Structure formats: C-alpha cells, structure tokens
Amino acid sequence: MRYISRTVWVLSLVSLFTDMASEMLYPIMPIYLKTIGFSVALIGILEGIAEAVAGLSKGYFGKLSDNRGKRAPFVQLGYTFSALAKPMMALFVYPVWIFFARTLDRLGKGIRTGARDALLSDESTPQTKGRVFGLHRGMDTLGAVIGPLLALLFLYFYPGRYKVLFLVAFIPGLMAIFATLFIKDKPVKEQEAIDKIKTGSFFSFLKYWKTSPADYRKLVIGLLFFALFNSSDVFLLLKAKEAGLGDTAVIGVYIFYNLIFALFSFPLGILADKIGLKRIFIGGLLCFAAVYLGMSMSHHLYAIGALFFLYGVYAAATEGISKAWISNISDQKDTATAIGTYTGFQSLCTMLASVIMGFVWYRFGSTVTFVLTGSAAVLVAGYFIFLPTFARHE
C-alpha cells in the first residue's frame, strides 16, 4: 500500500488508541454518573455542553491551524487533552469538576479534528483520498470494537470498579500521546506563511462560509440537512431494547456494528476512489434509510442484527467519504477550516437532531420517529443524486 504514508499510519494508530480509551468508558459513563449523584437531566446538560464545545471549537481551531500553517501541534495538544480528561473523571465527584473534565475531553476533539483531517488530505491525492480517509476511519472504529470488549472483560472480573476503569483507560490514551510525537508538519513555503498570525475571534471561522467555493456550500448544505435527522446511536440501541433484546444483546449488536464499520471503511474507500465518492456516499444514505425503516417494524434478533450490519456499512460509506469529498473541493490552504467548519456545524445539528428525535419519540412513539428519519434520508439521497459532480474523483 504505497499510497498510505507513514503519517497516515501514525494518525490511524493514534485514533485507534484514543477511541479504544473513549469506548472503554462509553457503555458505563451514564451508570458511573448516576452512581456519583448525577440525575438524567444533569447528564443531558453535561453531554449537551460538551458537544457544543466540541462543535464550535472544531471550526475555530481548524481556521487557526490554517492561519498558522501548522497541523502537528494541534493534533498533539488535542489528543493530549482527551487522554488526560479520562483519569480526571475519577479523581473527584464534584459536578463542576466532572463538567470541567468532560468539557476538556471534547475540547481536545475540537482542537485536533480539523488539523488531523487536513493532514490526511495533505498525505493523499484526489485519486487516493477515499482509501486514506477510509483506512483512518477503519482503524478509529476498530478501537471502538476493542474498547467495549476490554471494558466488559474488566467489569466481569472487577464488577462496579468504575473509577479504576477510568484509570485503566488512561493507558491507551498515553500510547496515543506517545504516537503523536512521530507526527511532523510538512515545510511551509515562505510566501504561504504571510499573514498567518492573524486568527480573529472564536467565531471568525464562520466568515469562511461566505468566502468558500459555491460547490462547498452546496455539498455542506446537503450534509447538514442529513445531520438534522441523524441523531445519536443511543436511539437505535433503545429501539433494539424496546424490540425485546436483553442488555447483553444490545451491547453485542453495538460492538457488531462497530466491527462492520471498521472492516468496510477501507474497502469502500478504495471503491470510492474507483467509481466516485458521490456514488458511495449516496449508497450509504440509502443503507441508512433501510436501517431506520427496517427498525420501525423489526422485533427479531436476527433481523435487528442484519440491520446493524447494514448500519455499519452505512457508516463506512459516509463518515470518511464525506471528509474526503470536502477536501477534494477545498483549497489546500483552507482544508482544516473547511472540514472544521463542517464538522462543527455537524456536531450542533446532531445534538439538535437528538433533541428533536427524543421529543417525537415521546409524543408519537418510536415507529413514527424511525419512519420519518428513514424517509428524510431518502430525500437527502435524492438531493445528492441531482447535485452536480464537482470534481473528477467525486
């Protein structure tokens, strides 16, 4: 795989270790917070604030990375913050401290995302971006498979030792920090470094929307419209639980989904480079629609398992592909800003989608909620079908 550079492999390993640490804690986070006195409402506020911080900071730090002409420092600092936040959650149980630690974790994600994806873009060509972003997403998601399995194994031998698990999760976080030390920036030409010091306000990245290429805006409008209907995966797990699956089976289908996501990301990236990013992305949207429409009427373990398989294919066909697509139609000097602006808005839309889906579920039931979501995905797929192809390899 000559087109996969050393930097891409390092970034992929860093993401694997980081996601391993995060996903070790994901299944037990709500349980731990409730044991230290957090109400469901307070947990919701905590996650909402954390996601808002992550979303807004992605755009700002993406633009800052472009302005400074640097990628590595943002990647290193971002992953360090996220790693340090894990054991901090176990040190004290005061709500203010928990809010600080959780926000630090998401701030780390905001700092690194734009710069990391710009590095991936810099290390690829229009002909290889699908497979480069696909490999990275696959390794990242492999961590999401290993993490919960390690957590289940730990809690099997040490039930209820949640604080210790937070400390154990620091180990892969440390490995990620160490790996980031091998990431180096490419030299920036002197002419390209002119006026790089001006950074602007925290919301200055929003100005990029006005000056960005029209093709970028058309693409991102479609992506954000989809994000408004693409709520948290928690709702799929709740639907599986409602259909009669036990706790172990629910965790099992979640791990299965991540495994399929990891296995299919790189092959679909290769296929996207051959037949076009747009075609693979639309195929992913149709998989998403099939999953939500299918979940609205499925009540058997095997049917739900098949739908979670399809959900893993959807994720592999869209998550890395969308960033590769954006980087293909953005100027190289603005790549971090372009991706950071999109992922920032995407985080906010996803948060809003979860609120809307929760309300619709409460008011009209899960079946109506899933049918509406699946139908909306079909409409978004139609938008992309009629969207012009912007570049040779889309």
Set out the residue ranges of the language-model regions.
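Helix-loop junctions on the cytosolic side of multi-pass membrane transporters
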Residues: P172, A179-D195, I385-E394
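Cytoplasmic helix-loop-helix junction between adjacent transmembrane helices
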Residues: A101-L142
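Juxtamembrane intracellular "pre-TM" segments in multi-pass secondary transporters
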Residues: M1-S5, P187-I221
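Structural signature of the two symmetry-related core transmembrane helices
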Residues: P73-P87, F170, R279-G294, G374
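Helix-loop boundary and gating motifs at the non-cytosolic
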Residues: M1-A54, D215-V253
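Transmembrane alpha-helix termini and helix-breaking/packing motifs in multi-pass membrane transporters
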Residues: I31, T35, I146-V164, L352-V368
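Symmetry-related core transmembrane helices of the 12-TM Major Facilitator Superfamily/SLC fold
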Residues: K163-L181, T369-I385
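Helix-to-loop junctions at the C-terminal end of transmembrane segments
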Residues: S57-G69, L155, S265-G276, W361-Y362
